[in-house]
């Protein structure tokens, strides 16, 4: 399934030329990489940008491991900028680069460089990330699919589609799965290996089992009043 993400695509396009580093944030697996590397890249080409003026680096790719060195990445980008025409620098998972802030800030003074980056770790979940760019960071925050985006592609009976959306959410990968078992497995795995880990890392938590139990309790009482004191006492006596 191809979700066009028109709203966010327009935000990326409208930020072109604003003199800032465009920082695409959002929870993991919400579609940041696809938006940048597929949809936005396609739109740039449709606007007439030559492919050799789009510098695209997926830093999560093992084959690009050497580019996680900040000096090597800088040299790589500089070598690809061979004229004074505008270049679009698209970097995915930039937090994997040591001192990535310095790398990106280096291009603030380059007049023909337009920089767009994504990041997914705990640091990029913080509003403090924009301050790293000397007041010249422009955040574009991506959410999972809205129901309108979901239904535009899924179609069918609207009530049934809404029930599925409420039950499984709007992560693009989940929407593309057919079987309920596959949806549940994907969500379970991403919760355990990604979301829970991000919360633990960001807050330096030591009791992962306690956090997992807290999430289980909160998930079981959605739509009901929450007695914070009772929950706290549960953990005190555990």
What are these regions (language model features)?
Residues 24:
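Hydrophobic anchor at the beta1->P-loop junction of P-loop NTPases
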Residues 2-19:
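Pre-Walker A adenine-sensing motif
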């Amino acid at each position: 399934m191809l979700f066009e993400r028109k709203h966010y695509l327009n935000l990326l396009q409208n930020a072109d030329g604003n003199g800032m580093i465009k920082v695409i944030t959002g929870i993991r697996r919400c579609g940041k990489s696809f938006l940048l590397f597929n949809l936005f890249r396609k739109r740039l080409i449709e606007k007439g940008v030559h492919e050799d003026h789009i510098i695209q680096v997926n830093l999560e790719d093992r084959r690009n491991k050497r580019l996680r060195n900040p000096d090597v990445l800088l040299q790589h980008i500089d070598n690809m900028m061979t004229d004074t025409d505008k270049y679009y620098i698209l970097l995915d998972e930039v937090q994997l680069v040591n001192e990535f802030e310095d790398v990106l800030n280096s291009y603030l003074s380059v007049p023909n460089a337009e920089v767009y980056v994504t990041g997914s770790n705990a640091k990029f979940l913080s509003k403090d990330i924009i301050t790293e760019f000397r007041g010249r960071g422009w955040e574009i925050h991506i959410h999972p699919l809205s129901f309108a985006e979901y239904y535009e592609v899924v179609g069918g009976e609207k009530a049934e589609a809404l029930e599925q959306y409420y039950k499984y959410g709007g992560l693009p990968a989940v929407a593309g799965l057919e079987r309920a078992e596959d949806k549940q497995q994907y969500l379970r795995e991403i919760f355990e290996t990604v979301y829970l880990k991000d919360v633990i890392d960001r807050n330096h938590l030591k009791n992962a089992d306690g956090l997992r139990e807290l999430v289980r309790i909160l998930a079981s009482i959605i739509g009901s009043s929450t007695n914070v004191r009772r929950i706290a006492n549960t953990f005190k006596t555990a």
